[in-house]
Structure formats: C-alpha cells, structure tokens
Regions:
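ATPase nucleotide-binding head domains, primarily ABC-like/P-loop NTPase cores
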Residues: 269-270, 277-517, 521
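Conserved amphipathic alpha-helical "coupling/scaffold" segments
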Residues: 1-137, 242-263, 270, 286
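Conserved core positions of repeat-based scaffolds
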Residues: 450-455, 459-620
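Long, charged, glycine-rich C-terminal linkers/tails
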Residues: 156-173, 261-286, 355, 455
C-alpha cells in the first residue's frame, strides 16, 4: 500500500494501517474509498504534485528562529499545491460527503505561498528582487566586484607583477581579494598582508587599490545578510501565524493521499470495496489471495501463463463452522489464508481481493492456526504446539470471533486426532463461534451430517488430470482419491484390490451415504448460488439506477439555475463567453432566438445563451 502513495505524508499513514474493531470508523474509511473511486472516474484523482511533508519545518517556524531559504522553497511549493487540491475538492459531487468533510480541513494558502515565492526562488535562493533594499545592495556589491576585478586584471597584466607572484591568480581570504606574492618579493606590491602559507613561502597580499572596495563589499555583505534575515523572519512569521491551520491541512492531505493509494492499490490488484454485514454473515465472492495475484502478474511479465482460481466462501448464514476436507496441496490452506486476509484488510478499511457484493462482519478477534508452529525452546511437539494454540482460541471463542484452523487433528494418531477435532468443532458450534477448519481426516466429514450448524466443503479434484482445480465446493466433502490416483498411475490391479479390502466398513458406509446425498446437495447449492447472484445483480442495477436518477436530478438543478440566470440577464450585465474565454457586456437579449448580443471590446457578437455565464458587476 505504501508504494502507491503520492508523497511522504501518505506513506507514513500507509505504514501504520492495521485492522480495528470500531465499525463506525471502518465504515467511514470504506466510504472514503468508495467516494474516491467514483471521483477518480469523473474528475480524476487529486493532484498531489509538489506536496511534501513540511510538518517539521512548520513546527519550527517560531520567531526569532528563521527558516532557511531551502526550507521556505519546499514550504512554498507545498502550500501552492494545496490550491490545486482545494480546486479539485470544489469539483466533488455533493454525494461525496466523507471526502468533502475531510477536504474542509484543507486550507488554501496560495497567498502565503506567493509571499514566500517573492522572497525565495524554486532552488531555495533568496531572490534579488525580494525587496528594493536587497536589489540595491546586491547591485552595489556586483558593481564593486567589477571594479575590484578591473584592479586585479590590470595587476595581472603587468609582467613585473606576475614575476613576483607564485601563480598568476587572485584568491580570497575572509571575503577579501588577495594576490599570492612570493615571500622574497615582500613589499613589491603595496597593500596589506593578511596571512602567509604554512611554509612561509607565499604571502597573501590585498592590493592597496582594492582595500577600500573590499571594505565596501564587506559592509554591503553585512547589509545583505541583515536584509535577508529580515525577509526570512517575515516569511517565517507568516507560517507561525498560520501554523495550526497548515498542520491541520497537512494531516488532512496525509489521509487524502492514503485514500488515493487505496484506489491505486485496488486497481492494480483488482480489489473491491466490501460491505460490512450487521448480522455476522461472511460472504466472499470470487476471493483471491493477493500473493497469488502478485505471482500471476510476475508470470505475465515473463510471458508465462498462471491462473488464479477464485473461491466463493460463506459463513454465518445457514452454518457457523465450515469443514474443508481433501488431499494435501489441494488449496485448503490457501482458502483459509484468503479468508483471513480478506477479513483483516476489510477491518483495516482496505478494499479486498474479492468481487463487489462481498460482505464481511467486524470480528472482535481473528485467530489463525496455520502450519507447524512448534517451539524448540519449549520442546513442544507438532501436536502439542497445535493444541496449545487451539486452547488459546477456545478461551476466546464467541460469536464475534473468527477461528481459522489448518489441519485440525494433525500431528498425532489419526483416530485420536479426529476425535479431538470433532470435540473442538462441537465446542465451537456450542459457542456459535464462526470457524473454518481444514483437515485430511475423513472422520470429520460426518459432523456436517449430524450438526445442523456445520457444513462440509472440499477443493475440487479433476479425476481426469489427477490434479486439484482449486475451486472450493461448499456442501461437498472432500476425498483423498489416493486409491483412484494409484490406479490411474499404474499400480498393479492386485494391489489396488487388496487396498480396497483394507478400507474399513465404516469408511465405506460413510462414502456411500455421502454419495447418496451429493446430487441433492449440489442442486441445492446451485440454486442458492443462482439466487444470490440474481440478488446481487438486482442490487447492482438498483444502485446504478439510483446514481443515474441522481445525475439527472443534478443536471435538472443546474439547468433550472441556468434558466433563472439567463432570464434575469439585462443590457449592461457582465458575462463570460465560454467559446472565446472572454468577458463582455450584454447589449440585448433575444430570448425567442436563445441568443444574446455581447460587446467584447471592439466587436459585438451574437452568442448562444447556453455559452454565457454571469460575472459580478465591475468595480469600475
């Protein structure tokens, strides 16, 4: 996110982004993002060119301390840039309530910026014309330097003088122009000896003819420094008098830049703004893991093809616990990581890697146990480490907690692991705690058939290619497919037959029971998905219709305002003619022709009324 900001102000904010649990504040952040996304499509993103983090300079702008010219140049550039951002904010749609509220804190400091620019230029140098006094002093310095130059040039053209010098060049000592006289020719050039070289072989002499001129330049340099200090103090005082408003503006610009970064981030990763659900229901449509999206983009740069398979996930509507089963490397872990990231991003006020219409609750806690987190220092086994994490989760499990567990029951005897896994799932169900768990233990599948608030899911497996498709199928338990895969890979039929004989009767009964309900479950899931898709489409069309209606109403208001304005036009009124970008004066109005005759200086022209806008009366 920090890579998508426009300036250092936004970067500092982006690096502090983290999930929170205040729903009102999350709603505000997401509304700001939505409004910026819409604004970017109509008036573009705010122009941040020239904005710098000048907060430290503004804080230290306390007389008698003076800011340096380089600092003032950067401050001027930043304050000048706020003028363009204020103009951008004035163009926002009336519906952009959050952005308009934020931009009310952005002041227009163009007047102060102009004051600073009259003192320092863009390179951080004090301008010659910063004041009449400074121009006069610098002009006199330049003239005195020219006169000294003439004196030195004349001396260096004298071949006797050049023989007395160690080298035929003038140099400076304490702002005084001196000549490098060889010590053996001491006294040959009338003047003042200011110093000698370390060896004593060279004496640095100020020619007598240049002494008065050098004295005058030193006096003028002092006057120059005094005047510059006065000017810098004046500029610093302007900042001091407005420092609170400027700091508030910079804080608002930092937030605005962060919102812009979110929009750029969303465009690059194809993210969407989630809705916050009030009933605790989680619905993710076409969710993708951001790192997989990044890997896909990197592959495209190398002209390689890489698919990112989206998943649809729901939780909390007709079930609280989703048990994802199936073989390893099938995408189970990626699924729960995708859900975890989507929820955390939403609660940080960020767009999420899912489609429009996705809804996310505000969880008070999100617990994730993924992979082997055993601690060598505590000498914990894989299972012990896993169990320790689960115990922490269970103490905090409640309806506002999201629990995500990878490979529940792993790391120990499969039967005992499955028993513990079932007990943990039942505890989560009893607490109405929303959870997603992955496992390769088949015994956990049966829970969904006896617990009404539990549901199975699997990562789809292509039996033809013997590869997972990575699609998440809710309502269908997964299978390891180990025997089928072994058979397709050519394991001898005799061994396959023996392997099937070793399958337990309970396993076979469960498999037959699952197969018997699978078709009806698929049909029900398909019907539910189609109904939800239709509902989302209706919502999308409703929102689009409301926006179109609002746009028409705004145009109607503008038209009515224009009609009222045009109807009130009288001879002598000042108007702006858009076609020529010039102002003029109404001579007469021809409402029947929707035209007006306008005097624009030397000419009178007949202009369509639609090209006119009223101007305030002239002060003349």
């Amino acid at each position: 996110l920090a890579d998508y900001v426009s300036c250092a102000l936004g970067r500092k904010h982006a690096l502090k982004v983290k999930p929170i649990t205040r729903q009102d504040l999350i709603e505000q952040w997401l509304d700001q993002f939505r409004e910026m996304l819409e604004a970017s499509a109509t008036i573009g993103l705010p122009p941040f060119g020239g904005v710098h983090d000048i907060r430290e300079a503004v804080r230290t702008a306390v007389p008698p301390h003076c800011l340096e010219p380089e600092e003032l140049a950067i401050v001027a550039e930043t304050l000048d840039a706020t003028h363009a951002i204020v103009n951008w904010a004035d163009s926002l749609n009336e519906d952009a309530i959050q952005l308009k509220t934020l931009c009310q804190s952005i002041g227009d400091f163009k007047t102060i910026a102009d004051t600073l620019r009259r003192i320092v230029d863009g390179n951080g140098e004090v301008r010659d014309d910063a004041s009449a006094k400074l121009r006069s002093v610098r002009t006199e310095i330049a003239n005195a330097q020219i006169k000294i130059g003439h004196v030195v040039d004349r001396l260096l053209r004298d071949r006797h003088v050049t023989r007395w010098l160690h080298y035929p060049e003038a140099t400076f000592h304490n702002d005084r122009l001196v000549l490098p006289l060889a010590a053996e020719h001491r006294g040959r050039i009338p003047g003042i000896i200011h110093r000698s070289s370390d060896s004593g072989a060279t004496l640095f002499v100020e020619p007598a003819e240049a002494v008065e001129l050098n004295n005058r330049i030193i006096e003028l340099r002092y006057e120059e420094r005094t005047e510059i200090t006065r000017l810098l103090l004046h500029a610093t005082r302007q900042l001091f008098l407005n420092h609170q408003a400027i700091l508030e503006t910079l804080d608002a610009l930092a937030v605005l830049d962060l919102i812009v970064a979110k929009v750029r981030f969303a465009r690059n990763y194809e993210l969407a703004c989630p809705q916050l659900s009030s009933d605790g229901t989680l619905r993710l449509y076409a969710a993708r893991h951001p790192l997989l999206i990044e890997m896909q983009k990197e592959a495209q740069k190398r002209s390689e093809h890489r698919d990112v398979v989206p998943i649809d996930v729901r939780l909390g509507d007709d079930f609280d616990v989703l048990v994802i089963t199936g073989p390893n490397t099938g995408g189970k872990t990626v699924a729960i990581k995708t859900v975890a990231l989507s929820c955390l991003m939403a609660q940080a006020g960020l767009p999420i890697p899912a489609n429009e219409g996705s809804t996310v609750p505000v969880y008070k806690d999100i617990f994730v146990d993924v992979g082997d987190e055993q601690s060598l220092q505590q000498s914990l086994s894989t299972f012990s480490s896993h169990l320790k994490q689960l115990m922490i989760m269970l103490t905090r499990a409640k309806p506002t907690t999201l629990v995500l567990i990878d490979e529940l029951g792993a790391g120990t005897d499969p039967d005992e692991g499955a028993a513990i896994g079932q007990a943990i799932v039942r505890e989560l169900l009893q607490r109405r705690c929303p959870a997603m768990v992955t496992t390769h233990l088949g015994a956990l599948k049966s829970l969904a058939y006896v617990e009404p608030r539990a549901e199975n899911a699997c990562v789809e497996f292509d039996h033809k290619t013997l590869q997972p498709t990575y699609r998440l199928l809710i309502g269908e338990p997964g299978t390891s497919n180990a025997i089928n895969i072994a058979q397709r890979l050519g394991l001898p039929p005799k061994i396959i037959a023996v392997a099937r004989q070793h399958l337990s009767e309970s396993h076979l009964q469960l498999t037959r029971a699952i197969r018997g309900t699978l078709q009806s479950r698929r049909q029900a899931e398909k019907a539910r998905a189609e109904a939800e898709a239709a509902k989302r489409q209706n919502e999308k069309e409703k929102i689009a219709a409301q926006r179109e209606l609002h746009a028409l109403q705004e145009k109607k208001k503008e038209f009515q305002k224009w009609v009222e304005t045009v109807s009130s036009l009288r001879p002598g009124d000042r108007v702006h003619v858009r076609r020529f970008d010039r102002s003029g004066q109404i001579v007469r109005v021809q409402l029947h022709k929707q035209m007006a005759v306008v005097n624009m200086g030397a000419v009178e022209m007949e202009v369509p009324l639609r090209e006119l806008s009223c101007l305030p009366p002239s002060n003349d």
